[in-house]
Amino acid sequence: GRFVAIVGPSGSGKSTLLHLIGGLDTATEGSIKVDGSDIMKFSENEMSEFHRKKIGFVFQKFNLLPMLNVRENIVLPLTLGGDPVDNEYIDELIQFLGLKQREKHLPGELSGGQQQRVSIGRALATKAEVLLADEPTGNLDQNTSYEIMEYFRNLNKKYGKTIIMITHDMNLAQNADDIIQIVDGRIV
């Protein structure tokens, strides 16, 4: 697993590329290979399985359900998918993300950084191999942004997760193993 940052000006195609990799958008030509499989050829069921098992998404907006506590928000993809919850893994994930003391708190009782860590936990609850992060620090202050980068680095190094992150902040991008720059829809 690698930690890759994709950078470029607004409107350059960064988020579009991430959405194509994650199968949220469909390309008009070519192929998109993730983990050796051409996702452009997936049936609807295969794409659904791909989203549930292989890919975790972290967005700029936390998208947490306000009536669910930290743990319930993290296990939500498993609950919705009818998948069993590996409580030992979820406990380890909550501990790793520094949320053990906040496990029973609702999103409104958490700081922005804590909410983003919950969304990272939710993205990883299914044991996804690839984490796609679209401006994950866009709503956070600089110190909290660097804390989130530290979690990403640790996820990559300790757990071997592949992380593809969109950012406009070159300082944050420097935390990645590789930096890809996009200008006008082209990798430069």
Language model: regions and residue ranges:
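ABC family nucleotide-binding domain
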Residues: 1-175, 179-181
